[in-house]
Amino acid sequence: MTKINNINNYKIFGVFDGHGYNGEDISKSVSNYFIDYYENTKFYDETPIHIFNDYKKDDYNLIRKCIINCNENLHKTLNCEKSGTTINTIHIINTKIINTNLGDSRTIFIDGNNKVIQLIKDHTPDSIKEKERIYEMGGEVSRVEWVDYGPFRIWFKGENYPGLAMSRSLGDFDAEKIGVINIPEISDIDIVEKNIKICICASDGLWEFLSNDRVCELVLGYYNSDDVKGATRKLMEVARKTWEVNNNMGIDDITIIVLFFK
């Protein structure tokens, strides 16, 4: 979590899930760039916090610009032909939350009626619009050839490469040729208006075998006892067990952020 320029009313949380040979370096570089970009943007140094009432236009544009600049920086600094990272961030501005997604990480919100709200769908190759773009660019979408389970992946036509399980990311410069794009989706919600009490942001390792509703069930008791660390540990524990049961190839990296609003 980062508090921008020590402004109490503005905080950023994020999950950056790297993949490929240089995935760890790329995810670290992108997360650091993201924070440095916001810390060094004069918009925040010079703008009183009350002006964020008109946050949407300025912040949406700032997020998009940050991601574009970050991708250009990756071109200059790291080998990203076969590696990249997803991005899922939560910007909290007073009572507003802006959620940005690029890839297959996910954020959900739980309201006072225990209803789950997901503002942005995962960017996966099997979703209709994403698949159409990939095929138009000459790519193919299928599961790994020798198994009948697991995520759909993106391939060069007739090849067994690159096998990405997400259709949007930063980096992955080879996969850009077959429709993998770095354009994020951005949406927002008001904590007070929608009576939001829990926010969970996590990499696909949490969501692969656990539904939104199951994740909600697992954390509700911890909300009542105000035990956010316990909720995070429980999700991690259950997620790892589901991987052990459902996948004999190992356990995916799992990153989880849990926020309680009281």
Mark where each language-model region is.
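PP2C/PPM-type serine/threonine phosphatase catalytic domain
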Residues: 1-262
